[in-house]
């Protein structure tokens, strides 16, 4: 079971590496890692389990965050606010297309690998199309917008050594870009 002690923190070199693509079939170890990542997200969102194990709540986790520089992410978002849920374990995810229009969370973003609150708006694409494989190597294609699009972009950034705060404007951290949509 993954706990907070397994999640590496900001400053660890793995968080700035470009993760390696995986080939199929996945090793049993990689499959177990991906399942454990999903399990962490579910546990972190369960109040009792999170309290028992000292877990911070999360909706996404990338393998580099547990010091595995591999292109694997898990997203567990039981309700996106519009009645749609997202429960994915993805391998080698890629953003294939994206909207010009940007979106941001008015409260900024957080990260399980970043302990402190870093104020500032993170502008991302409002819509994205993602291609990946599931744990068995089947092709997956997702069209996302709004909050789910932001979550998946955040996790894919981890696979490329990018942290959310890299996008925050140092001069005007709380100023929304023109035409950007608040999510």
UniProtKB/Swiss-Prot annotation:
Active-site residues, record numbering mapped to chain: 155
Catalysed reactions, semicolon-separated: N-terminal N-formyl-L-methionyl-[peptide] + H2O = N-terminal L-methionyl-[peptide] + formate
Cofactor(s) named in the record: Fe(2+)
Cofactor note: Binds 1 Fe(2+) ion.
EC class name: hydrolase
Family annotation (Gene3D superfamilies): Peptide deformylase (3.90.45.10)
EC number in record: 3.5.1.88
One Gene Ontology biological process: co-translational protein modification
Domain of life of the source: Bacteria
Disulfide bonds: none
GO MF term list: metal ion binding; peptide deformylase activity
InterPro entries linked to this entry: Peptide_deformylase (IPR023635), Peptide_deformylase_sf (IPR036821)
CDD domains linked to this entry: Pep_deformylase (cd00487)
Metal-binding in keyword set: yes
Binding locations of Fe cation: 111, 154, 158
Keywords attached to this entry: Hydrolase, Iron, Metal-binding, Protein biosynthesis
Similarity comment: Belongs to the polypeptide deformylase family.
Function (record text): Removes the formyl group from the N-terminal Met of newly synthesized proteins. Requires at least a dipeptide for an efficient rate of reaction. N-terminal L-methionine is a prerequisite for activity but the enzyme has broad specificity at other positions.
Entries under NCBIfam families matching the protein: pept_deformyl
Name of the featured protein: Peptide deformylase
Organism, scientific name: Staphylococcus epidermidis (strain ATCC 35984 / DSM 28319 / BCRC 17069 / CCUG 31568 / BM 3577 / RP62A)
């Amino acid at each position: 079971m993954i706990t907070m002690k397994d999640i590496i923190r900001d400053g660890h070199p793995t968080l700035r590496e470009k993760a390696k693509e995986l080939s199929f079939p996945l090793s049993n170890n990689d499959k177990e890692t991906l399942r454990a990542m999903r399990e962490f997200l579910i546990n972190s969102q369960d109040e009792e389990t999170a309290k028992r194990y000292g877990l911070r709540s999360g909706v996404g986790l990338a393998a580099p965050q547990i010091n595995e520089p591999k292109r694997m992410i898990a997203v567990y978002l039981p309700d996106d606010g519009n009645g749609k849920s997202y429960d994915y374990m993805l391998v080698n995810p890629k953003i294939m297309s994206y909207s010009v229009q940007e979106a941001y969370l008015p409260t900024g973003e957080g990260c399980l690998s970043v302990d402190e609150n870093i104020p500032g708006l993170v502008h991302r694409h409002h819509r994205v199309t993602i291609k990946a494989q599931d744990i068995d190597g089947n092709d997956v294609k997702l069209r996302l917008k709004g909050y789910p699009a932001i979550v998946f972009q955040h996790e894919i950034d981890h696979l490329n050594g990018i942290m959310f705060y890299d996008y925050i404007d140092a001069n005007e951290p709380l100023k929304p870009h023109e035409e950007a949509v608040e999510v």
